[in-house]
Amino acid sequence: SIIADDHGRFSGLGLPCHADIVKGWGPLGGIYTALHHARPGGCFVVACDMPFLSGPLIRAMAGLTAGSDVLIPYLNGNYEALHAFYSPGCLEPIGRSIQRGERRVVSFFEEVAVRRVESAWIKEIADPARVFININYLDDLEKF
């Protein structure tokens, strides 16, 4: 599925498109909406501006999800929250974060089981410098 505040823009792609349930909450609101519409096992969330995804990395990460509510890459002291798996167990904690006015994706992590995927493990499968790059302008894309 595609989650976007302007979901009509993507309706021609042949994929289910859903508007944010909670408007104006950025990535946390998008994850909340994705989980609301997800299958019972949860979902993999990725940002729309990450064009160099690695299928092998995503599949390998999927194999690590058992026992965790959030499976998330952790590189250079930062979480890659928009390249992560989220279980249905995150839905209510995210809802509480939104009610408290918390906008940071990590705001609910203390309430759920989080498993970090360390950079050394990722580097065995994919190049983090490429996989986690964000392209915000066409000029950025031309560099690759």
Question: Can you say where each PLM-predicted feature lies in the sequence?
Answer:
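Nucleotide and nucleotide-moiety/phosphate-recognizing core
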Residues: 1-102, 107-129
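Glycine-rich phosphate/pyrophosphate-binding loop and the adjoining helix
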Residues: 122-144
